[in-house]
Amino acid sequence: MDSDTNRRANEPARRAAKGVLRWTCLIVLLLQGLTPNCFSFAAEPLPPTHVDDFIGRPRVIIMSDIGNEPDDQMSFVRLLLYSNEFEIEGIVATTSTWQKSAVHPETMHALIEAYGKVRSNLLLHAKGWPTAEELDGRVFTGQPGYGLAAIGADKMSAGAEAIIRAVDRDDARPLWICIWGGANTLAQALLHVRATRTAGEADRFVGKMRVYSITDQDDTGPWIRREFPNLFYIVQPSTQKGDDYYYATWTGISGDVYYRNGAGADSTIVTNEWLDANIRSKGPMGKLYPRFAFIMEGDTPSFLGLIDNGLNAYRRPDWGGWGGRYIYRQPYGETHAIWTQGGNTFSRVTSQDTVAGVDGREYTSDQATIWRWREAYQNDFAARMDWTVKDYSHANHNPLVEVNGQAGTAPLLIDAEVGKQLLLDASQSRDPDGQGLHYHWFHYGEAGSTDANLASVTISGADTAKATVTATGVCRPQWLPRGQCLGNGTAHIILAVTDDGSPRLTSYRRVILTVHSGSTR
């Protein structure tokens, strides 16, 4: 037997032995309270300028500690009414710091049963709704215990296996893991893959995932980020106690009153009274939408930015959208950069947006990156709830936006030269219900802030179908003087098109300008 044949023959035994050694190392170090360092990964994380340019609906797995308080159930109702926007490949019932020894898949099944009663009506308004049976078959139980103590070599759960199957699927699209509770089911899946595959195979596995976690609700989130540094991870790191939740971007979904961090936001459309009138009063799904105990739908931002509304925020977290805006940096206590909050105030590269509030004054905060879109995402939800009980002619539907002859929702990429005018024409946009349309173009000045240069632009005709954009500088001014501005700049122009229906619905298009001076082109 030659050496190559012998090596191939011994490969299964070699890999099995390697797996045993890895698990042994893991167990010993965990028992000693130490962070395992017996697994190393050489692959680099995706660069912060990477754009997920895939075709098709986003693939998602939801991990929820549903049952501990009402907001998970609220978010789950909204998720089901947008289930035609995603490919939901798994729904995992998990534990968390608020629910350490129980999981509640039965609540998920009950909500899916109600969805099944309205699916035929939803099909009158849009295509792509999964059947209730399909969704029921994708509900899994995650790790039954809390945090790191519940993971290990012999602790695989159905939820962890579902994550592995979904990642391994032959599909070029990344898999979004939306974490509403604890992260230990994801940790178990990662541990199993790392112990049973080569380093290169495990790297490729990790590279297929995109994680958006609603803070850290057990002790595995920080552990995952230390052990798998090339994993794409959106999170504002936090303690497990929740005493710093008020700082997190996701609270911008509705947390203004409870967390006292939403000055400028319109809190009237996230009250129980508004929800009674616009959500709970409508059909089987509305009846299962509970009153909130603390805030409305704290977990919803994890998937809200994946909705195909024209903002395309899921392609790069610093572009900003309904799920918030994040930048790539290394927070205190983390071992490497992640997608998170904070930034450099002096260079004006931060995760905060400056937005006009309901009183007309400007407010700057991380939460504003979500609440700036609140009227649109709440009206959109109310319209979806109408779809569950009304026929097409008595419900409202989103405008269809066309810019410079390009229909669809993909961003437009255009070169622009400083000092030269650029016409953006959306006059061919239309409303499927025949209603009037209102246009608003604006420069999203903070979007794309990972890029070296954020350009300056002006917009004339901002409230008409045809706007004229003029780039005034490759680099915008900073609070501190700096040297010469080199290279090209970037500017994101957002078009919001709103109809006259009830509720009024908004669709968007994003135009990304690469700005250069005539001398550098």
Where are the regions that the model predicts?
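N-terminal secretory signal peptides that target proteins for export/translocation
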Residues: M1-G19
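Bacterial N-terminal signal peptides
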Residues: W23-N37
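N-terminal acidic, glycine/proline-rich low-complexity segments
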Residues: F41-L423, S429-A455
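Surface-exposed, flexible coil segments in extracellular/virion-facing regions
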Residues: H443-L480
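Short, solvent-exposed loop/turn segments at the edges of extracellular beta-sandwich modules
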Residues: T498-R504
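Extracellular and select intracellular beta-sandwich modules with Ser/Thr-enriched
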Residues: R504-V511
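Extracellular interdomain linker/stem segments of modular secreted and single-pass surface proteins
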Residues: T514-R521
